[in-house]
């Protein structure tokens, strides 16, 4: 593939500008015969998870295709599943630029995007037009100007709109870039949110005559006691899966590197150890009661295997995909 040459050119640009240019091109070919330009053949390695058959265990994490603009082109690269979003009820611009930074030596990224997206109605239109043959996850969040105390209303609004079109729904309560959002991961706030989400799921199942599983995406920056509490809440409320993990606010492994002091969530290789440890702890606590979708620092076959050995049933890539391109998909799926 030409990705090493393309990457060399893109990495000369501001990270967000490089992302915009790449997606402009992918948007032009998505859903057209020109998808052959990015298509690659990967073996089928079916995994049954959350009651769904995934054609292979490797997915694209949320955050790359926030509005579902390029689902078909990304799908042509061989992902078993794609998670679009995070999407909010209303369009919002996100945080001020610059808000995305490369830590090239570390194979990492720091972002403080802030759920920039064109709103849930726009996403649904894009999803309706797509023809992706894999599983489509839709990641939902709350608007920045919605008070945290009313945050569950945003999740329920998004759930209602995406439910007919989602393979599964991911509930993002762990981004560090929306003020107060991570407080929804704990105690009564978490129980209140999960109860409302489960009740909504039951109502939507009755209305649409189909069951769409719900997974909750958690942060890596929790103590073991906090993780145990989260796991207990997920099981008690019959949530279908957990996505571990989101980005970290920690900087231990990137001290002294360019951009390490930027505010935001760190992803990529520096997150691999911590996210894998969270998965291991969750797996020990959950004892198979619900599946784990593992992400955070997967940039090689070995990193992918480490996640699965720790207890993940499915895995997702984001930063590794940016640093290594579509070839990483084939390398992982072929030998996982």
Curated annotation (Swiss-Prot):
Pathway: Pyrimidine metabolism; UMP biosynthesis via de novo pathway; orotate from (S)-dihydroorotate (quinone route): step 1/1. Binds 1 FMN per subunit. It is an enzyme of class 1 (oxidoreductase). Gene3D superfamilies: Aldolase class I (3.20.20.70). Monomer. Belongs to the dihydroorotate dehydrogenase family. Type 2 subfamily. Coiled coil: none annotated. The gene is pyrD. This is Dihydroorotate dehydrogenase (quinone). It is found in: Cell membrane. CDD domains: DHOD_2_like (cd04738). Its main location: membrane. It comes from Sodalis glossinidius (strain morsitans). It is a peripheral membrane protein. PANTHER family: DIHYDROOROTATE DEHYDROGENASE (QUINONE), MITOCHONDRIAL, DIHYDROOROTATE DEHYDROGENASE (QUINONE), MITOCHONDRIAL-RELATED. PROSITE patterns: DHODEHASE_1, DHODEHASE_2. GO terms for biological process: 'de novo' pyrimidine nucleobase biosynthetic process; 'de novo' UMP biosynthetic process. Its EC number is 1.3.5.2. FMN binds at residues 62-66, 86, 139, 172, 217, 245, 268, 297, 318-319. Substrate binds at residues 66, 111-115, 172, 177, 246-247. It catalyses: (S)-dihydroorotate + a quinone = orotate + a quinol. Keywords: Cell membrane, Flavoprotein, FMN, Membrane, Oxidoreductase, Pyrimidine biosynthesis. InterPro entries: Aldolase_TIM, DHO_dehydrogenase, Dihydroorotate_DH_1_2, Dihydroorotate_DH_2, Dihydroorotate_DH_cat, Dihydroorotate_DH_CS. The keyword Transcription regulation does not apply.
